[in-house]
Structure formats: structure tokens, C-alpha cells
């Protein structure tokens, strides 16, 4: 499969539907062949599914891009040149408790995993930005808390990894003042990487 073929294949995916899982949207992601940075979220939200069909374009997305602006990224340029994907690609529906979105099950994550694997192989982003606990666990494991990971830089399988907390307004993580300092350090790392790495043709 090539990167040109991948969006059409992804849009026709029926793996979760055929397995009996709720599907609240068509698959949502943004792919660019020259992407140096790739954000990886949990799953599209309701706003993305029903209104924009763009990753991180609801209230959480606005907060995310305010953070990225502090690191020197322009939203329009980022969307046009970088990659934005998720652990699962379709809106999973509301949380049973009535607040926020349902967390995709492990089975759904496994069904969607080949898409992320293909994108990592085809795009080869230098920097991964996993956003929120589910995505962070995918790349850095679940043995360490977000408190110990946010504000640090890691290298795995040829990728630099800079985790960010989920920008949801429902997150309690930001109630701890020290966590805001950790977020600031993470954004400083991203700003430095943008200055050092630059566009794809500047990479070794």
C-alpha cells in the first residue's frame, strides 16, 4: 500500500462495524507525505464527527493549537503540512456515564492498529506527539504516569516522542500547578525541535 492509496482504503474500512462495534463517523485523519511531526490522539470527538471531519477541531483542538502556537506552530500550516492521526479513527460515541467520549476498547484499538502502523511506515515522521493517556501508553507503555512523562523527550524506533496531556476541558490533570510547568517544558521541547529539525528536506 502507498500513501496515495491509504486514505481511500481507510475510508472504506469496516473492521469495527463488522465486529459489532458502534461507529459514529467515517474515519478521520490528516496525512501529508512530507510530515515531520505527527500528532496521535485517542479518537475523533463528536464535533469532529458531526461538523468538521478534521482531527482536533473542536474545543479540545482549539486548546491544543493554542499550546502548539506557544511552540511556534501555525494551525493552518500545521494542518497543511504535518500529520494528525489517532489510535482509533472513528467517533466511538458518548461515554456511558454521560461526560465526554467513550474510550475505545482494546479490541477496537487492535482492529485500528494496522492503519497507524502503515502511516508510521509510509510517512516516517521524525517527531511523534502522543496526546492523552491512551496514545502515550501506545508509544511509551503504561508503567509510568503522565506526571513523569510530560515535559520529557524520548526516542523509540527512530522517532523522537514528546507526549502532551489531553487538552480536554474535563481533564483534572491541570488542577495541579506543577503539571502546568510540565506542559510548558513539553512545549519548549517542541519549539526547539521545530527550530533544529525544520522541514523534511533538512533531515539527514
Language model: regions and residue ranges:
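A polyanion-binding, active-site-adjacent surface
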Residues: 1-198
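Intrinsically disordered, low-complexity and often Lys/Arg-enriched segments
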Residues: 199-204
